[in-house]
UniProtKB/Swiss-Prot annotation:
Disulfide bonds: none annotated. HAMAP family: NqrA. The gene is nqrA. GO terms for molecular function: oxidoreductase activity, acting on NAD(P)H, quinone or similar compound as acceptor. Belongs to the NqrA family. NCBIfam families: nqrA, PRK05352.1-1. NQR complex catalyzes the reduction of ubiquinone-1 to ubiquinol by two successive reactions, coupled with the transport of Na(+) ions from the cytoplasm to the periplasm. NqrA to NqrE are probably involved in the second step, the conversion of ubisemiquinone to ubiquinol. It comes from Chlamydia pneumoniae (Chlamydophila pneumoniae). It holds the Pfam family NQRA_N. It is an enzyme of class 7 (translocase). Keywords: Ion transport, NAD, Sodium, Sodium transport, Translocase, Transport, Ubiquinone. It catalyses: a ubiquinone + n Na(+)(in) + NADH + H(+) = a ubiquinol + n Na(+)(out) + NAD(+). InterPro entries: NqrA, NQRA_2nd, NqrA_C_domain, NQRA_N. This is Na(+)-translocating NADH-quinone reductase subunit A.
């Protein structure tokens, strides 16, 4: 199937990494096991400060779903366990042991039963890689998915492409073979043919994949790489009992690497980007998952007025230098943007020849040209205002979902109405563009994300229950 996305926005942000190649690998001294994505679930810590851990060792367990673990991808010593509001777990910091210390496994994918595969996925932290729709939460191991979608079309700003991730291997052929093994493991575990969504320019081993998966291509501007759009186009979710699992290209590489190489894949490709970062420092690097920011960029060169983001500028997590930030669990980029503290002189009279605008507030909005954010920053240009009931949001929402009525239903906790409007098909990140262009400065992304978790808790899916 060919998915064509017409609505959206061409985000050609300045500050992208250089395309000239990779610098040497960066081996950080400290890494983080990020537990923030698992906050919807109750976790039970399996380590304490000062404990020695090896690669593959359990760090935390799903409290209500025993024997499902979040594991360490490195060997070392736990130096800190950081908590947030109400003592919620943020991350576990590990000081790496020098040298190769990977734990070796031996698995024969062909002879393993589905039950054996399930235990391997849960015990080795592979299940923690999977996300679940509806609600966009960590996948629940007791749920049986109707479909599995694998996303190779992610086009968020500054996010490394699948081709970049293949630099982890000695050749493209080896990388794609690891990917095929990962797809085979997923297909066997869930007893179905997963859907793989990619872009035409990516050369996949289609002959091998056609026998085990459904292949779809997608084209169009951001957010055409969103799994929500892929599911909406191929097999929409109509009720909360229709479970769909989603994975990224990197997740499948991690799964395939364990079954093929017998080791946890501990490295990743990371983009260092943003206009507040010196052009000589914008690049792609190969480093350990969960690496510290300080090992990848010199934080002393970052102004206190600049914004550090783990992830992309639209959906990433804001970080502070003094909090010793680390890469997030699913983040493959560090974005550094300017955060202006002074208002422009006569800002209310600015014509805006080269200003980004979607509502034609500036003169640049009347020129038919490729929209480019010449120097993206985090300036809101105003305070929060009453939400405007207009169709501008729908022009950047590719799915047939009315943005303003849905946001109003979610804010008022009218989940029955929200479901009728398509609430079960979306995730918070689908509202990144409506949030970006919103004249009222409403944090739609955060509102939707938190409301999905609240609704998931109300539904009882996050705790064991008898059918």
């Amino acid at each position: 199937m060919k998915i064509t996305v017409n609505r959206g926005l061409d985000l050609s942000l300045q500050g992208s990494p250089k395309e000239s190649g990779f610098y040497n690998k960066i081996d950080p001294e400290f890494v983080s096991i990020d537990l923030r994505p698992f906050q919807p679930l109750s976790l039970k810590l399996k380590v304490e400060q000062g404990d020695a851990v090896c690669s593959g060792a359990p760090i935390a367990e799903y409290k209500h779903f025993p024997n499902t673990y979040i594991t360490s991808h490195v060997s070392g010593v736990v130096t800190a366990i950081r908590r947030g509001n109400k003592r919620s777990l943020l991350d576990v910091i590990i000081k790496k042991t020098p040298g190769p210390t990977s734990t070796e496994y031996t698995y024969d994918l062909q002879t393993l039963s589905r039950s054996d595969l399930s235990e391997i996925f849960k015990e080795n932290g592979l299940f923690a890689l999977i996300k679940q729709r509806p609600f966009d939460i960590p996948a629940i191991p007791t749920q049986t998915p109707r479909d599995v979608f694998i996303n190779l079309a992610d086009n968020r700003p500054f996010t490394p492409s699948p081709e970049k991730h293949l630099a982890l291997f000695s050749s493209r052929e080896e990388g794609f073979y690891v990917f095929v093994v990962g797809v085979r493991a997923i297909a066997k575990l869930f007893g179905l043919r997963p859907h793989i969504v990619f872009r035409d320019r990516l050369t996949l081993p289609t002959q091998e994949l056609k026998t085990i998966a459904h292949l779809h291509t997608v084209s169009g501007p951001f957010p055409s790489g969103s799994p929500s759009i892929h599911i909406h186009s191929v097999a929409p979710i109509t009720n909360e009992k229709e479970v769909v699992f989603t994975l990224s290209f990197q997740d499948v590489l991690t799964i395939g690497h364990l079954f093929l190489k017998g080791r946890i894949l501990h490295e990743q490709v990371t983009a260092l980007a943003g206009t507040a970062l010196k052009s000589s420092l914008r690049r792609y690097v190969i480093t350990t998952k969960g690496a510290s920011f300080s090992s990848l960029i010199n934080l002393n060169d970052i102004s206190d007025n600049d914004t550090l983001i783990s992830g992309d500028p639209l959906t990433g997590r804001l970080c502070k230098k003094e909090e010793e930030p680390f890469l997030g669990f699913r983040d493959h980029s560090i974005s550094v943007l300017h955060n202006p503290t002074k208002r422009e002189l006569f800002s209310f009279l600015r014509i805006g020849f080269n200003k980004p605008t979607f509502t034609k507030t500036y003169l640049s909005g009347f020129f038919k040209k490729k929209r480019t954010y010449t120097n993206p920053d985090t300036n809101l240009h105003g305070e929060t205002r009453p939400i405007i009931d207009t169709d501008i949001y729908d022009k950047v929402m590719p799915m047939r979902i009315p943005v303003v009525p849905l946001i109003k239903a979610v804010i008022t906790k009218n989940f029955d109405l929200a479901n009728e409007l398509g609430f079960l098909e979306v995730c918070g990140e689908d509202f990144a563009l409506p949030t970006l262009i919103d004249p009222s400065k409403t944090e739609m992304l955060t509102i939707v994300k938190e409301s999905l978790i609240e609704y998931a808790k109300e539904s009882g899916i996050l705790t064991p229950h008898q059918d």
